[in-house]
A protein has these predicted regions:
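Active-site acidic catalytic loop and adjacent metal/ATP-binding pocket
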Residues: 1-42
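C-terminal catalytic region of ATP-dependent kinase domains
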Residues: 27-165
């Protein structure tokens, strides 16, 4: 769940099963599994918002089924909320670095105008936030997404993540 949230928030696309690894972390009485991306060529590139949601890829169905069978819906939602809070704290804690990166992304032609327009329309549809209208680059999309996340992270319904296009 946390991996899916990070992909959506960071606009990290195409996270099919062959583009990430599962790292087991052994503790005294349990094993925690963390998912780490290993392929970043689709970050902030795609115009289809669903491509930033790894749980929608057919290749990932076995893991999604495992999560559904092992975790309660309440736990899944709690993990999503926790991950958003962690991301917000990281954004605020690294504000200067993030701003510098975003500024360079604004002027870099990472994706086509069509993909930027399509993605901003879909995010606007989800958020109803006017700041997502008329954006010109993926850097601007990411900046507005981070700002939205920071200003709304206590709102557990933000981005209505269960909505599918």
């Amino acid at each position: 769940m946390k991996f899916s949230e990070r992909c959506m928030i960071r606009l990290l696309g195409d996270m099919r099963s062959y583009n990430y690894v599962i790292v087991p972390i052994h503790d005294f009485d349990q094993v925690i599994y963390k998912i780490r991306a290993i392929d970043f060529d689709q970050q902030s590139y795609e115009g289809e918002f669903s491509l930033y949601r790894p749980q929608l890829f057919k290749d990932n169905e076995p893991i999604i089924d495992l999560v559904k069978n092992k975790l309660l819906v309440e736990s899944i939602n709690q993990y999503k909320i926790e991950e958003r809070a962690i991301v917000v704290k990281r954004l605020l804690g690294s504000k200067n670095k993030i701003e510098s990166l975003i500024e360079s992304m604004k002027f870099d032609k990472i994706s086509s105008d069509e993909k930027v327009n399509k993605l901003t329309q879909q995010i606007y549809f989800l958020t109803k936030d006017n700041s997502f209208k008329n954006l010109k680059s993926m850097g601007e999309v990411l900046e507005k997404s981070f700002n939205y996340l920071i200003s709304n992270y206590e709102n557990h319904e933000m981005l209505r993540i269960n909505k599918v296009f």
